[in-house]
Structure formats: structure tokens, C-alpha cells
Amino acid sequence: KTCEDFMFSLAYYQYIHNFMAINTPVYYYRQNLNSATGKRALQHGLDYQIVFTNISNVFNLQNFPKETTNIFQRRWTRWIIDLISNYKSQNLKSKDIEAAVYSQPYYTAMMHFIPQGILHRIELWLLKKKYSRGIALYCNIMMHFKHLLKRYKL
């Protein structure tokens, strides 16, 4: 089996009992259009709630350093922001976006996400104020800005 999407694949995470983080790249990750990460649909967001809870429990049981937990929280936050920024291609309505963004545990993760830089502070402020349309507009602007700069991440 391919491990291309190992870190983000539901197939692996559904049965997780243990988790280990290392500070060395094991493989080169690329986004597979047929993978769970390639299909940014609302249903994946709802499915990931189970995954998030399981991994959070593993972090708590194994007493992982705060830095490791923060890395996980940041990755999760970026995924939700990407989900919102791609809402047009998924035909998601504003209420569907709001339901995904403000459902637990995503909202809690984002509220505890440590702001780093102006972009993260803007995102955090929009989330605290619960401006769903503002978040969607902001993400669309950033998505086009990223495209112009040919950058992958915000």
C-alpha cells in the first residue's frame, strides 16, 4: 500500500492505537487528487472529528510535548481554512460552512491555536467574531494572492 497520504488518511487513523512524532521527513508528501486530502468535501470534515478526538487522546495519554501538539493543531487549522476557501468548488452554502467551522472540536482547536504573524491573527479574529462570510471572503482573497505569488501555504 502507498503511504503517500499516511499522515492524513482516514483509513490509517480510524484504527490508531499509538502515535509517534519525529523531526525528520520520512517521505515526500504530494497531494493525490483521489485521496482524502484531495477531496475537500464537508463529509470529510465531519469524519475527521472522530480522527481528531482519537489523536488528541493519544497526545494526552503519551504526554507529548506542547510543541508537538501545537504542530498538530496548526495543521488541523490550515485544513479547515482550506475547506472554507474551496467552498465554491464544493457547492457549500454559508450555513454548511458555519456548521463545519464552529462544530467541536475544530472551533476549540482554532481558539487554542497560537497566533503567529498577521495572517494568523486575522483568521483568529474572524473566527472569534464568527464572521463566516468574512472568513470565506478573506480566504478567497488569500487564495488568489497565493496563486499570484505561486506559494502553496499562507
Residue ranges of predicted features:
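Membrane-interface aromatic/basic loop that binds lipid-linked glycans or pyrophosphate carriers
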Residues: 89-154
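Short, charged, amphipathic alpha-helical segments
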Residues: 66-74, 97-100
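Amphipathic alpha-helical repeat scaffolds of TPR domains
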Residues: 71-85
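Generic structural signal for well-ordered, non-membrane alpha-helices
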Residues: 50-57, 78, 143, 147
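C-terminal, non-catalytic tails of nucleotide-sugar-dependent glycosyltransferases
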Residues: 50-71, 108
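Secondary-structure edge/capping motif, primarily at the C-terminal ends of alpha-helices
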Residues: 59-62, 83-91
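Conserved nucleotide-sugar donor-binding catalytic segment
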Residues: 1-48
